[in-house]
Amino acid sequence: ELNEFSPRADRPRREDRPRDGRRPAGAFPRAGRPADRRDARPGSRSRNEAFQDPWVDGQPRFLPMSRAEMQALGWKELDVLLVNGDAYVDHPAFGPVLLGRWLVAHGFRVGIVAQPRWQSPDDLLVMGRPRLFVGVSAGALDSMLAHYTAFRKKRHDDAYTPGGKAGARPNRACLVYANLARQAFPGLPVILGGIEASLRRTTHYDFWTDSLRRSILLDAKADLLIYGMGELAMLECARRLAEGKSLHGIDGTAWLAKVDENNVPVDLPEEWLDLPRMQLPSHEAVQAEATELLRLTQMLEQQVHRQNAWAQQMVGDRALVLAPPARPLTTEEMDKIYALPYARAAHPRYREPIPADEMLRTSITSHRGCGGGCSFCSLALHQGRRISSRSQESILAEARKLVAQSRRGQVAISDVGGPTANMWQAHCALDDATSAKAEPGARPSSRCRRSSCCYPTVCKSFITPQMQHVGLLREVAALPGVRQVRVASGVRADLALNDPEALAAYTGEFTGGQLKVAPEHCAARVLDLMRKPGMEVFEAFLQSFVEQSRLAGREQYVVPYMMSAFPGCTDEDMHELARWLQERHWSPQQTQCFIPTPGSIATAMYYCGRNEDGEEIYVARSDADRLRQHRILMPDFGRMPERGGHADAEDAGEGHHREPRRENTTERWRDERRSADGLAPRHEGRRDFREDRKPPFPRFDDERESAPRRDFRHPDRDGFRKPGFRQDVDKPFRPRPFPDAARDGDEAPQARPSFRRDAQDERPFRPRGDRFVDRDGEEARRPFRP
C-alpha cells in the first residue's frame, strides 16, 4: 500500500529516470522548471537555486535521499544509512541530521531515509546497501509520546511531519525500523539511537500498555544501542567497522553479552577492570518487586552523573552491558559541530511546510545539558548534568549565517539558549578541581553525589555566569541585520534571583511580552517530589519581574507551566493550586497532565507508588482520577468518564474562578427570527452546542421535535426529507412549492432505498459519517462501489 508521506517505490520517480546521459534531474534544475518555484520553506530560495551546486563548503547541500542525489555527489555507495522517524530538515536541532553531517565531515558517506513506509523495506533499498551500518532513530520524540496524549487519546497532528499530519511513523518506531533494516540488509549491523532508544535502554515502565518492558535492544534485536548524545560514539562505531574491529567497549553504548559462571560478561575491555561496576536489578527482579524499578532508575542516574562506572543488568541468562557514558563535548568540538554548513531548510522533496522547521528555523543552540535534575524530566538522563557550551564567536558566526540566509537580509532570532537559557557557561567547581588534578587523557569523573544542582537550593559549587549570557545576547542583537533577540527556551527562576542585574536584562531587553517559567505546582510536598524549589522562590521572582517590567516601561507577563496528576499529588493539592491561581486572577493556559515517560524518577514513583525514600504516596493512576485532577485547573478540558457531555461550572473545584460564557447576540437574533417563522432554534440538535448537557443524539432522528430539512420528494413526512431515501429515477420529479402540496391529491413520486436493506426487517441504512448505521444502531460495512 502507498501513503502520502513517501515517494512511490514501485516505479521510478520522474526525477530519478535517466535523461540521455545528462546530469540527474534530482540534484540539478530540470529544463522548463519555473525559476520561482519554492520548496517547503516559505521565504526560501527557489528549487533551482537550491540545487544548482550539490556541494557547499565541502559538504553536500543536502544529505542524499535518493539514488539521483547520490550520483550528483559522485557517490556510488553509502557508508552509513540513517533511518529517521522525522521529516528531513537540515537543521542542527534535528539529531540524525547533525550526526550525518558530523560523519560526513570525517570522510564517511551518509544518506538519510526519513519517515519510510513500514509495510515493506522498499524505501530503505532506494540508495542500495550501505557499507558499514544502518542507524535507526524514532525522531526527536518518543514515538508513543508523539502519537498519544496524557489520556491515551490519539493525537491529530505531528510537528515533525510535512503539513503537520499524524500517521507518518509507526508506534514504537525503533522496533519497526530495526526490523525493516534487518529485512532489507541481512547481516548488516543495526545501531539504535535517539531519545526513544536512550530512555528505554534497560527495563522500563510503558505507560501506554501499563506494563513493564525489557530493554529495547532485545526487542529490536539490534547489534548496539547508543544512549545519550551520540557524536563521539557513532563516529567511533564507523571507524571501528571500517577497520573491521568489534563494536563492544565504546563509551555511551549498550550491548548484550554472554556471562561466565560468576555472571560476569565475557570479552570485556581490559581497561574496564579498574573501573567501578554497578550491578543493576535484573529484569526478573523488577517484575517481581515494583520498588526495584525505582532503585534501578536511581542507579542509572548516578551512573550518568559519575561518568566513570559501567553497569550490568541480567536479562535471563544474558547480560545487558552499559558502557560508561560518553564524555561531554569540549567547547572546540561543539563549535566544529555547529559550524557545519546546515541549509536550515526542509529538503526540497517536501511540498508542505513542516511545523517544527517553522519553530526552530531562527533558533540558536548555545549549550547542552541541564543541572536542574527535575524528577519528571529526561534531559539530565539523556544529555547529562554537565553543561557543554559553545564559544561566543561560534554563536555570533551562526547568527551572521542566519542573516545571510534570510530573504531580506534581516532576521528576528527566536532563541539563544538550551534546555535552560541562563545555564550557558555554567560549571561545577568540584568537577573543575577534579579535572585539574587528573592525568591528561584520564576518564572524567565527578565527586558530587547530589541528585540536582538546584534542589533543594542552588549548590554553592554550581557557578552560573548569567551576565556573560546577557553580554552574548547583546552582542547578537548588535549584529547588522538582527532585528531582535528573544529567549524562548525559558529561564530558571532560582538562578535568575541570584543575579538581579541579569534578571533586569532578561526582563527589559530579551522578553517578547511573555516569559516562560515552570513553577509546576505550589504544594510544598509535591514540589519536593518534583525536585523543584519552594513557591516562595517563584513568588519572589514574579515580584521582581513585575518591578523590572514597570521600570522598563513594558507590559509583560509570566507564562507559568503547571502540572497535574503528578505522583503524590492529591485532589486537595490541586484545589490549593487552583486557589493560588485564583488569588492572582490567573487563568492557566500551560497545564500539562503528567505523562510517565520511560526512564525518569517520577515514572518509577508512579509505577511503584512510593517516593525516593520508600514512603507510600498517592498516585492518580486511572484515567478518571487523572482527568478529574486536570479539570480542577482546566474545567473545559475533555469529558468526565462517568457521564457524557461537558461538566458544569461547579465541578471546577473549590475556589476556582470561571468566567461566565459570553452571550452570542447574533445567534440569539437568528433564533428569535426562526421562532417567529415557526422554526426551531438553529442550535437544537447540534453536537457542539455547549449549553446542551445531554449526550449528543444522531444528526437524523425521527423522534426529535425540531424541524428537519425540507424535501419535496417524499409524502410520509409532509414534504420533508426522509433520511436514507432518494428519488426513483424511473419517474419524473416535479418540485412542489410548499410542504403540504402532497395533501392536495397529487400523486407524489415513490422512493426507494439508496443503499442495501437489512436482511431481517428490510429497513434501510442511514449514513453517519464514514459508516452505515441501521435504525437499531448496528454498524454495517459500506457497500463497495467501483
Label the model's feature ranges.
Residues 1-44, 636-786:
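Basic Arg/Gly/Lys-rich low-complexity intrinsically disordered segments
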Residues 51-77, 87, 294-363:
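N-terminal [4Fe-4S]-dependent radical SAM core
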Residues 75, 80-85, 98, 113, ...:
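Conserved SAM/AdoMet-binding glycine-rich loop
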Residues 85-88, 351-378, 412-414, 595:
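N-terminal pre-triad scaffold of radical SAM enzymes
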Residues 87, 95, 114-315, 322, ...:
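Glycine-rich beta-alpha loop elements in corrinoid/cobalamin-binding modules
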Residues 119, 247-304, 312-317, 325-329, ...:
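Terminal amphipathic helices with adjacent charged low-complexity linkers/tails
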Residues 142-151, 199-201, 231-236, 259-263, ...:
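Flexible glycine/acidic-rich beta-alpha junction loops that bind and position SAM and/or redox cofactors
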Residues 223, 337, 395, 517, ...:
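Conserved, mostly hydrophobic/aromatic
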